[in-house]
Each structure stands twice: as C-alpha cells, then as structure tokens.
Amino acid sequence: METSALTELERIGAWTRDQLPVMRRRHELAAAANRLSGAGFVEIPGVTMSLTEAYAKGRDLAALFGTGIISNNDFTAEFKGELVHQHIGELKHLAGDADASAAFVAGLSGPVRQGLPNLLLNTGSSTARADLAAFSAVFGAALRATKPPPGMAEYQRELAAPTNADAAWQRLALLKGSGAPSQVLARTARLVLDEFAADPGQDWFGGALDEYRAYGLPGDSVTLALQVIADDPVAVRSVFAEMGRPPVELTRPERMNLLFEYARHRDADVADALGRTMATGSGVHNEQPGAHSADAAAFAFDAITTSASLGQDMPASAQGSMAELAASYGHEMIAGARIEDGESRDSGMTAPPHLSTIPGLTPSFYLSPQGTYGFLKTFAAEQKNTDTFDKAMGELRHDLLVQAARLDGEALRGSPPKDPGYFEVTAGGIGDLAGMEYAAALKTRGDMDAFDEQMRGIVTDTASLALGAAPSPEKGVRWLIWQLGMFGTGKALDAWEDGDPADTRVSKLDGARDKWILAQRYDIATKLWEGGFPADPPWPASLMKDGRPLPLEEPLKDSKIFETFSAWSDSTDTDGDGSTFDKKLAMGIRGTISPESAVTAKGYEKQP
C-alpha cells in the first residue's frame, strides 16, 4: 500500500501544530494593538517571542517589580519610586502582549496584586497616577489572555472573593480604565454594589485621602464601582440586571432608583458616574439612534422612565448624560411627545393603539407624553444640555420631513393621486416635542429671557447662522431651525394664554419677528423641495444655487429674496387643486409650531 500520501498529511499536521501557537499570538497581539490604538486597521511587528518566551518575559518583570522593587524592604521609598519610574516603559510595552501580561500578573504575589495602588503610592513616586495607569493596562491585557498561565486562576479567585471596603477600593482603582473583560469589571463592581443594595446607608469610603489625591479617584467605593463599568455597556447592563442577588431581589428600575436616591445626597462624582452608566448601558456611545439593540433599548426604557420620575430634581452632574441619552433616543422622544394619539397613555415597549405613522421614525419603545415631559426636565435647566439634544433633533427633523415630503409627493403623482398626509403628521410630532421641550425649559429655568435674546440675535445677525459650535454650516442651520421652533412655540404660547398684550415676548420681537416667520416658511419649503414634493410652477431658478435652494442665510440677508420666495409660494396655491405646495407648506408650519403640547405639559404640573 502506498504510504506517501499519509506521510505528507502527517508532515502538514506537524507544521500546523507548530504554527497554531504563533497564529494565535499574532491574533492576540493584533487585538491588543487595536485596543490600545483605537484604529480600524493596525500594523504590528512579526511575533518575536514564542509563548514560552512571552511567559518568561512576564515572570521576569514580575520578579523585578514585585520582590525586586515594591516588596523590597532593603530600599527606601524614594529609591523604589526612582526604580519604578526607570522601568515603567518596559511595563507599558508589555501591555501589548496578553500572554506576557498574564505571566506578569500571575508572577506577582497576592498581597501585591490586591494592594498595588497603595503600594505604588508608598514608593514615593511623583508619577504615581501614570504608573498606576501602566499597571492597569497590563492587568487588563492579562485578563483578556485566552490561554493564561495557571497563576491567573488564583488572581481571578481573588477578584471574586468578598472583602472589606479598603481592599475593594484597591481592586477597583487598579481595574478602572484597564479594558478588562466585561464580566470581570461587572463582577468586581458588584462586590461593592451588591452590599450597597442590601444596606445603602453604611459608610462606603475606602482607601485613603492621599490615594484619592494622587490618583484623582473618588473615595466613595460606590462611585468608583460605577466609574469602573461606566464605559462598558455589557458590564453596565450585567450589573443592573443582577445587583443585590442574592439575597436582595430588586427590579432594574428599583436598582436605578436606589442609586439615584443615593446620588442626590452625595457629592457630584456619584451622580456623574451614575449618569454615565445610564447613557452607556443604553448604547448611547456605541449604537445608532433609531437602530438600538434590544438589550440597550430595554435598559434605556428603564433609565428614561426612572429618571422621568425625578424630573428637575435630577442631580446637576448627571444632567449632561441625560441630554446625551435623550439625543440618542430622539425617535422615542418624538413618538412619546405625540399628544393627539392620547395625552394620558402609559409608557410601554409596544406601540399603543391608533398611533399615527411617521415614516422613518423607528422607536424601540413608546413613552407617554407625561413621561417624555418628565425626562426633558432632567436636563432642560442648562442651555448647554438642551444644545446637545437640539443638535441631534435638528438632524432628525430634517430627515423625517424630507422623507415624509417624498412619500406624499410620490402618492400625489400616482393614479389616482391621493395625499396620505405624512408631512402634516410628521410636522405635528416634531412640533409636539419642541413644545414640550420649551415647557420643560421654562419650568426648570424660571424664564426664557436669555434663550429669547439669543434667538433674536441669531435671526437678525446672519453671521450667526454659521454656528461655530456645529460641525458644519448646514448642520448649524438645522440646529438653529429646531431652536427657532421652540422659540415660535413660546411666542404662540404667550398669544394663546395672554392674548398678546403690549408687554409680552411677542410684542418685543420687533424686526426679528418677521424674519423668524419667514425663516420657518423658507425652511419648511426647502424640505418639501428636497423630498421632491410637486410644485407648479417649480422652484424659481433665481432662488437656486448649485442646483439647490439658496441657503437660509441668503434670504435672511436680502429681504428681496424673501419677497420673491413668498410670491412664488403663493402662486403654487390654486383653489380646487387639492394638496398644493403652498397649502402643504402652511400645514407644515402649523404642525411644527404649536403651543398645544406645551399647554398639555403645563397641565401635568398641576397633577398630584
């Protein structure tokens, strides 16, 4: 029997067995380099160490830093600090190799691993914060190793073992910013947060004052536990799904409420960390609005409805995160603000009956109008927070109106022509949310004088349309138009409630009033044009530039352009022609600027 084929297969198998460890290390080195650089593509050198050599490198550095420096009683603290600083570069390089890092961590003694932040500080190093960051990176890499040396199992057991507040603080300080696996971060944070769920009233301070100052970390272990998971969505959701078990059985909203209540009576760091975890667990930083994962959306629903119950009592340091959360869930905010579909409906994960269809709106859940208003109040007190929300809503407003205009226009060109009215419904949803935001800002700020003055200045100073804080002039105009909608809601609300006497906001608008109205008309008209909604006669060539309608700043600078636009718009309205361009324009303006939702929101304040 011919055996040459079998011999060849055996040769290939032997080669494969030799190559697999190298291939695995190439993969892990690439993953580590990608984590450190944040780049989409990474370039790494060839594998220069075998697995055995990587383990030896890690063990040698562990001996150097452990018994050689940190635990060496023959050296003064000052000399230890000099040695740590001298060799820290080797440690930073080690973080790029998970296998070598794992050998390093496994080679340290348990007391060194468990008390490293304190031990580093005791060396007297003037660069303790940077030194701890280097150690954290190595520990994170070690915990990501797929085939760690046996000693790593002991460290894993140490991390999972219950301990006192001081030791827990040391563990958390070392893992903060380490990039350790989600399950490790969650498990370590829960050692503190599980006890917190059982007895939130006890003293949660660990570590020492000099450690807080040296490392820039909070002394409150609850705060530090939240900071450790605050950038990892999987870890956040894991903690809030299990915190307190056993023996304390709580729902996720109850866990959130417990921490919000704690944050309201502690320093700003607690609320800041809690707000960040709410945003991270909701997928704010790693998912797209309108396309959130089921896990992130379910978390966000609980975060938003729980926060809404606090309203303007939300701690100030968490309000920025609430604005980011609202911006990321703009689809849900518009759906929740709809008052025509039932201002007294409850919040839920499924669509309520008879909810109007807004094309392009893809909410993952459905807030009640009252819940939407309550959540808006969690961040509306500060202009910088509403700016965050308004920038996102300006973009969404543009996209939804253009899509609705396109669908209505296509239907009108069908046979038989029939306008489904998506544009009006979409404009109404946008107007409802803008009105509620205005009411929330008015309630939390006490007055809107500063906002009004800003809006008046912008519409009378066309240079402001560039809006340097926006990523581009076009995005700046979209942001401005959203805020002008709020401005218009306030104007209409005054007229609604006060009959527009001489001393109201409306009467003080002077020349800005006409410009504001014209800006709204022009913007809505451009959305109809972008969507291809039919107009007869078509958009005038004199109002075009580079194949598009003139940008908004052009008519604001030249009133004659507005006159030409208004005359053309009026000419598109022919009695008996059904959904003409001008009629569609009027309905769009009426929808986007309405005081009804603001009046409804004010009514919620009167409820017990």
Predicted regions and their residues:
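Short, solvent-exposed segments of well-ordered alpha helices
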Residues: 3-7, 212-220, 453, 457
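Membrane-interacting alpha-helical segments
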Residues: 27-35, 39, 189, 204-205, ...
